[in-house]
């Protein structure tokens, strides 16, 4: 309605039958309405468009290990985990591309285990739909929200609390990995990356850098899908591209993570205890190595604190 009023006044101002005094008065009125309209629109979108400073993309290892609400509570960092099971790197690229239409993250965390996904890549249309499915809360109250919320895949999917918690999947079940880190046998060999993976990875790096978004490679503990050969090739890429790489499978003393109580399924995914340790370290790392703002005292971000308190009460 306000937009309609602005258009109506603009039409009136361009009416040649109006005298200059009347035009001047209406011009002042128009500027006031424009100012109010823009401020209201900006305030409404402030917590949505360009509000995420850290965007994380990956597979189920990511959404099980990184808790954006803990990052908020401990560091005041706004983040989102856009992840899906067995996520193909082509979909990772689509997630980044779609999110950049409404967000300007300062840091992009790439969970690197999905670089080795061997299933066939989806086409552009399929990847776009999946990208919006795994990141749709980032589009709420933005200029694209009407488009995204009406997608059939959004309407028919029961996301539970997964998206409500900024992409984090909370699970406090415990099933120990008795073999600990035995899967990480040192070797000089390298796992091969598919040509398709290399192409999409280069596109992701190029796109992120075009938007001045710094990249961080991360691999969370996973005894079923990670090896030293994979570590070696990602470490090579890290050095070649000058992208930092944190591998919690080799840097086992960075946290207090323990395979006895930190996994929900014997070593494939982390549980809430494991995620707490990973997120705590990453929050401190992000705070030390990147210029990220602490929004905890900013009243415009009070919704984040309310959401954290809601999460904290439900998990306890």
Task: Place the predicted regions along the sequence by residue.
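Second-shell loop/turn segments in exported
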Residues: 56-57, 81-85, 188-194, 219-224, ...
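Secreted/periplasmic serine-hydrolase-like ester/acetyl group-modifying domain
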Residues: 123-214, 295-316
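Acidic/glycine-enriched edge-of-secondary-structure segments
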Residues: 17-28, 78-86, 178-195
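Membrane-embedded segments
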Residues: 55-140
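Membrane/wall-proximal cationic-aromatic binding patches
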Residues: 4-77, 88-95
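Conserved, well-ordered alpha-helix/loop/beta-strand core segments that scaffold catalytic motifs
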Residues: 107-119, 170-255
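Histidine-centered active-site loop/cap adjacent to the catalytic His
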Residues: 263-304
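Extracytoplasmic/secreted proteins, especially bacterial periplasmic and envelope-associated proteins
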Residues: 70, 91-95, 107, 133-146, ...
């Amino acid at each position: 309605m306000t937009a309609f009023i602005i258009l109506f006044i603009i039409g009136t101002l361009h009416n040649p039958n109006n005298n200059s005094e009347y035009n001047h008065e209406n011009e002042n009125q128009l500027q006031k309405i424009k100012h109010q309209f823009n401020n209201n629109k900006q305030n409404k979108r402030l917590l949505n468009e360009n509000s995420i400073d850290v965007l994380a993309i990956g597979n189920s290892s990511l959404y099980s290990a990184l808790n954006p609400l803990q990052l908020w509570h401990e560091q005041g960092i706004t983040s989102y985990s856009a992840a899906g099971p067995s996520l193909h790197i082509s979909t990772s690229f689509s997630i980044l591309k779609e999110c950049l239409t409404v967000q300007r993250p300062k840091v992009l965390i790439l969970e690197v285990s999905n670089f080795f996904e061997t299933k066939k890549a989806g086409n552009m249309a399929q990847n776009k739909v999946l990208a919006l499915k795994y990141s749709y809360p980032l589009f709420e109250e933005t200029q694209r929200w009407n488009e995204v919320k009406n997608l059939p895949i959004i309407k028919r999917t029961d996301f539970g609390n997964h998206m409500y918690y900024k992409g984090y999947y909370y699970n406090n079940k415990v099933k120990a990995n008795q073999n600990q880190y035995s899967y990480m046998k040192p070797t000089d060999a390298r796992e091969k990356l598919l040509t398709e993976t290399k192409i999409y990875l280069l596109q992701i790096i190029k796109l992120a850098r075009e938007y001045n978004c710094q990249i961080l490679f991360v691999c969370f503990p996973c005894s079923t899908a990670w090896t030293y050969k994979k570590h070696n090739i990602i470490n090579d890429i890290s050095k070649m591209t000058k992208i930092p790489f944190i591998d919690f499978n080799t840097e086992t003393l960075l946290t207090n993570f323990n395979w006895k109580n930190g996994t929900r399924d014997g070593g494939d995914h982390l549980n809430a205890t494991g995620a707490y340790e990973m997120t705590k370290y990453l929050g401190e790392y992000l705070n030390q190595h990147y210029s990220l703002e602490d929004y905890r005292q900013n009243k415009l971000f009070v919704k984040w604190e309310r959401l954290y308190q809601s999460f904290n009460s439900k998990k306890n």
